[in-house]
Amino acid sequence: MCVQGLGFVGAAMAVAVAQARTPEGIAAYQVVGVDLPTPDGHARVDALNEGVFPFPTSDKKMVTALTEAHEVENLRATTDSSVFQSADVAIVDIPLDIDFLDDDPQLEMSSLEKAIRTIGRQIPKGSLIIVETTV
């Protein structure tokens, strides 16, 4: 399972999915967080791979969940979008920007469209793509 976009919401989603357990208590998913190969993206990826949440948070449960995921090694992060080739589920957490021009809201969707194209070119046919946007 991949989570595209490691902003606060995407990073939290990756941690939450990594917490899922089978009835036997085994990690239910191998989760890969994916971000852009930018300085910010690399910093987020590095933090998650070190078991550190990439944003300030007072949510102790999230910090504990990330520590557990790091210990059982079912959460990793990368800037390499080829990981979608082996994903059966992708969760897309890309913010949608709204600009107000002449008091009319204009929704900027180019980041979301680019992410969907990147995933669509690589993810296996029949896989599930879930779009969870923040506005």
Specify the residue positions occupied by each region the protein language model found.
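Structural/interface elements that position substrates and couple domains in central-metabolism enzymes
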Residues: 1-135
